[in-house]
Amino acid sequence: MQEQYNPQDIEQKVQKHWDDNKTFVVSEDPNKEKFYCLSMFPYPSGRLHMGHVRNYTIGDVVSRFQRLQGKNVMQPIGWDAFGLPAENAAVKNNTAPAPWTYENIEYMKNQLKLLGFGYDWNREFATCTPEYYRWEQEFFTKLYEKGLVYKKTSSVNWCPNDQTVLANEQVEDGCCWRCDTPVEQKEIPQWFIKITEYAQELLDDLDKLEGWPEMVKTMQRNWIGRSEGVELKFEVKGQQDLEVYTTRPDTLMGVTYVGIAAGHPLATLAAENNPELAAFIEECKNTKVAEAELATMEKKGMATGLTAIHPLNGREVPVYVANFVLMDYGTGAVMAVPAHDQRDFEFATKYGLDIIPVIKPADGSELDISEAAYTEKGVLFDSGEFDGLEFQAAFDAIAAKLEAEGKGTKTVNFRLRDWGVSRQRYWGAPIPMVTTEDGEVHPVPADQLPVILPEDVVMDGVTSPIKADKEWAKTTFNGEPALRETDTFDTFMESSWYYARYCSPQADDILDPEKANYWLPVDQYIGGIEHACMHLLYSRFFHKLLRDAGYVTSDEPFKQLLCQGMVLADAFYFENEKGGKEWVAPTDVAVERDGKGRIISAKDNEGRDVTHSGMIKMSKSKNNGIDPQEMVDKYGADTVRLFMMFASPADMTLEWQESGVEGANRFLKRVWKLVKEHAEKGAAEAVDTAALSGEQKALRRDVHKTIAKVTDDIARRQTFNTAIAAIMELMNKLAKAPQESAQDRAILDEALKAVVTMLYPITPHISYELWTALGESDIDNAAWPTFDEKALVEDEKTIVVQVNGKLRAKLTVAADATKEQVEELGLNDENVTKFTDGLTIRKVIYVPGKLLNIVAN
């Protein structure tokens, strides 16, 4: 065993051992309990960042812990390799996306190996290879044949600079989130998958996900957005009926206008002879916003000149085009009740429209709508036959009347929209559909799949190469000339089923059901909460599609979900001549701190004063990322892993502090030193519990308490940082423990073996080496230490004795000593009597097993 802890030598040696022995390569074993642990796979951007390291360290800790529990553990890795960044990089570097992507994969794979993650590399794949996306294409054609896929023209957010469609969430202040170009609206035909057919099941099955954070489930519930309401018809003079959806039919008698979306057919019709309205509609279409911003944006509208007839009281109300009505929610039209909806109230106030209250507070308090709408549920008035009814009774009665008159029906609505999977990009999986000369659309037959994306292309940064190359699109269908679809799949398609492909990556089908049903569902999934509503919802949907196609038997893909927090670091900037911020890397900044460790001044390496922007998320744009490679080279992978797991609870933000990394390194050096000193004295004998002294029993109790705590912290609570803190605390006690007698050494031997095994999931390289030094072999297949219940039983207890609240003595008593025995010992202790002589004992308070307080005066 080396004198000093040298991580570089150890880590290379141990990693070679894992590779040579295929330690983490697994197969199905029906005699063993399986555990499938998965971290969200990386996009091959070129280099790992600390966010990756945190995510994958958590996954590796869970995997190795479960392995020591004797389970058959699968931990795979692969590459989410399609996407726009590769196109942007290709244009910038004058190359094609494919070579850029494959080079990045090689580099990042090496980085992952240096960090010592226990992956089954035999299962590795990249989603940009035809061997992967071929099955996705075939599954898509099967969904088409089942009627779950359709094509329709839809208005999309179009970035003219990137030449691509953006999701609502990718539009920030009317501009593209990537390049800040003003976003336009464009009508284009797109492919959709009917996720709405599964909306109710996706909602209901959230209740089965007991191992998911409540916050993520709430986000998905809101995203799916189930509501119960009424779909009703307003007649429009000289036009077809206008259908609206409302969740508040109780307010129907307060309708004073109807709002329609700019994309509504009625709006288009009304604008035909109204240039002003046509211009307003165009403006609305080009300022599409994320739904989250609707509440705060300025409400704008314009009268169409059309009049709608109230379905129950026959009142005529104007029809307005309004910028807050969304075409893709409900029917694209809303009944407006300004007295009882804040958005309608603001609009009516702005345009001088009637505000008619019809709901008053149920508690009899006064109704006040002078400043804002009254939006609570209450009692109806000025509503004819429905006066006096409260919400549910009014809902049912008004819905029944509308149904009886053929003017409405009760209905359930979902906020969730069908999944638009078309992207006008090159670097994605081609959509396997063709159009023949008669305009008919057909899926590509299975024997002609995959439709291969050509990789040897020239990127001009504007048009997708497969759109520019007219020859690529030419094909045949049943001997007839046909044109290929030149859109590619949304990259969420690949990430929606990758977890399942890992179960049988070489299968000659999308999945091998036998293998998939052995491994699935994933027992532990780890990734960022930013994926709550897209990736995690699409994966749940895809799993149900796979189930209904007979590939899997489970309903849900991920049993337990851990969303790791972001990694933060200090960020510094100075203002340039134009007033813009120039961000300076923290490694190039010298700081001065006050007594509390707060930064009071900072200068960059050119001597310039820089401003400390605080601890913020590590990112390229803020130049505050720390390269994991540098840290591994400097301290070793185990130190980086230990810091990542210790510095913060896994689901909270982690503040990067190099002083903390140094502290983690010092701790590992202490463990190394103690094991080395112990091992050099030769083998220790077994613990003889009958021969232990009180002090030895107390130390052994600490060892087994620590084992119990660490086991619970990792397995149940997933508070890895507190588990590490408990191990550190135990190490402090072991370092001070006597090592004179044979039983002293026996306890230390048992304790060090427990410490090394408990550290193994977190710091596997040093643990491998120390395990060998302790005379054991093959820690990768060792058993997790079990705590001895008997060791936790105390023979004696220490009782603190206070006189008038001040500590005066400590008693060692038998664990089963009675209150009377403790009182007698306490009152007669010579140090206690010094402070009670001549006083009257007024009261004796005993807290069993802990404290004796004597009150005297």
From Swiss-Prot:
Classification via NCBIfam families: leuS_bact
CDD domains (UniProt xref): Anticodon_Ia_Leu_BEm, LeuRS_core
EC number of the protein: 6.1.1.4
Residues involved in ATP binding: 620
GO cellular component, one term: cytosol
Keyword Transport recorded: no
Molecular function per GO: aminoacyl-tRNA deacylase activity; ATP binding; leucine-tRNA ligase activity
SUPFAM superfamilies: Anticodon-binding domain of a subclass of class I aminoacyl-tRNA synthetases, Nucleotidylyl transferase, ValRS/IleRS/LeuRS editing domain
A Gene Ontology BP annotation from the UniProt entry: leucyl-tRNA aminoacylation
Motif 'HIGH' region: where in chain: 42-52
Protein's recorded name: Leucine--tRNA ligase
Lineage summary: Bacteria, Pseudomonadati, Pseudomonadota, Gammaproteobacteria, Vibrionales
Enzymatic reactions: tRNA(Leu) + L-leucine + ATP = L-leucyl-tRNA(Leu) + AMP + diphosphate
Keyword Protein biosynthesis attributed: yes
InterPro entries per record: aa-tRNA-synth_I_CS, aa-tRNA-synth_Ia, Leu-tRNA-ligase, Leu_tRNA-synth_edit, M/V/L/I-tRNA-synth_anticd-bd, Methionyl/Leucyl_tRNA_Synth, Rossmann-like_a/b/a_fold, tRNAsynth_Ia_anticodon-bd
Renumbered ranges of motif 'KMSKS' region: 617-621
PANTHER family to which the protein is assigned, alphabetical: LEUCINE--TRNA LIGASE, MITOCHONDRIAL (PTHR43740:SF2), LEUCYL-TRNA SYNTHETASE (PTHR43740)
PROSITE patterns reported in the protein's UniProt record: AA_TRNA_LIGASE_I
